Amino acid sequence: MTTPASSPSLKALLNPRSVAVIGASEDQTKFGGRLYKTLLQHHYDGAVYPINPGRDQLFGLKPYPSVADTPQAPDMVVMALPRDKVKDEIAACAARGAKAGIIITSKFSDAGPEGLALEREVVATAAAHGMRLIGPNCLGLISPANKLVLCSSPAVNVPRLIEAPIGFISQSGALMGTLFDRSYGMGIGFSHCVSVGNQADLELNDFVEFLIEDERTQVICSYVEGIK
């Protein structure tokens, strides 16, 4: 983590006014397609900016060639791009004024020294513009309290979200998806669920501190594999 996270910076992640989906599509075999579909499926009520230069329409919305072409800077961007494209895309989003981002892409510090070096460059690029990041190598987040789903897990393909005053922060994306799925089957919901991935910028403790102050969260659960 570069600097401690403030409540406003995490609010841009968990309750953004607008979201740009980089690589949005209607193809459900692709991460960008699943992220985009589930965001719309759960009736997120902020502005949605699908980013895809090759399409005229995606699920009824106008896509934009790049984040630089959106009507306003998005609070949040989410991407699942090939690793070698992430740094340039983060640079473009940060320069546009995006406040926060989720990087689903893996093979950064989780794949050795070369990936670690690139991960540090990505974080530095974002930090130079005050942009905060979840990931890389994460499943994203689920925020029923805000009707926000930016998660690549098939567990979120449900008819409706169940909101309850339980926050869950996980260092394992797979476990977050499994817990969400099993809880949903028992009628149990959440306020926010976050997969923190490599914690290159924001860490588990940042979100725990946010949830302590969150009015819609009364119980905090976490899955911890290690503490830095």
Where are these regions (language model features)?
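Catalytic-core regions of core metabolic enzymes
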Residues: 1-228
